């Protein structure tokens, strides 16, 4: 067998491989000899079928299987001997001429093919002990706990019927039945019976709740609204609609006394236990936000410390995924690049930079994990599946069966676990200092991004 490197351009490699007909024939004979003891042919005792006869019956299919395996094994040998890590699947070009193919299958001609690959570059890892990371820490204040409990109380507020003839006000809960039309034609999902609406909750289409102010039980109004441009249903997005709406019940919010009795309605023993639960939940939220900030700092530091050319094919794959998502979002919201003060070309350039960073960081994290034998256990993946199932009550078995039969989905669960374990490994080596901050400071970056 002869292997000749024909392309060595950056991370791209291409090889021309020649496999002698004699080598292919020998492999085919090995396969036929193995087959001899397994097949049953009329007129022959088990294991006594002549090889020549087997070759006439099964020769072409065995030759095709043998060549396929031979090519895969040969390629694996080429890559491992040279220490290549492949960025993508190899591109193999086999002979196309029909007569040449026939001669190869019949053992009359050598097999010559080419294999093109893109390799992952060698990555020299930084000294993580030189990394400095600042960890924001927020103490849970009593005022934070009080605010959290007030939000819980508001969400569990009781309502009582208003007096006969009363008019709806902001904050009231109005039970309505409605029939929606667009250009006089009813549409799917436009009808509702006895639907409770809290005026001012912003849970309905913009403008719908405002037009309920002043309505009384038994009164019917025509409410005119326009579906948002980013509405989930593309057939309704941006369209004006009218809802013939009748109020069937009107209730006013009642003051909620936050005491032991209120805590018991939530399944807790006392107000003190409710405060403890609220404080623990806030502490977990703050810790999660702090973790995100620390992780961002660490990824930025890894990005700065590992500059290399990433495989173009991986960058292109990552970019295509992001660009499809951007286009889908713009179509659903009706926004244009001009609305974002940019152009399509400028946006593409920016997202290619993001794709390059993501690919490089992914390769760096993978290299760190591999060199330090960091692995995700089956138990960790199972716990992630269980957690995902808990988020879908009543469909737990469906979720479990989905992941059990879908390796790609399971890999998507495994990836963030692996990333977090690598991050934890680096943080163990890095110089991490804690800094006391306020809640507002902790969430400032997120608030700024939301505003933007």
From Swiss-Prot:
EC code(s) of this entry: 5.2.1.8
Domain PPIase FKBP-type, first and last residues per copy: 171-256
Swiss-Prot/TrEMBL catalytic activity: [protein]-peptidylproline (omega=180) = [protein]-peptidylproline (omega=0)
Keywords: Cell cycle, Cell division, Chaperone, Cytoplasm, Isomerase, Rotamase
Subcellular location: Cytoplasm
Free-text note regarding domains: Consists of 3 domains; the N-terminus binds the ribosome, the middle domain has PPIase activity, while the C-terminus has intrinsic chaperone activity on its own.
Known function: Involved in protein export. Acts as a chaperone by maintaining the newly synthesized protein in an open conformation. Functions as a peptidyl-prolyl cis-trans isomerase.
Name under which the protein is recorded: Trigger factor
Origin species: Rhodopseudomonas palustris (strain ATCC BAA-98 / CGA009)
Biological classification of the source: Bacteria, Pseudomonadati, Pseudomonadota, Alphaproteobacteria, Hyphomicrobiales
Gene encoding the protein: tig
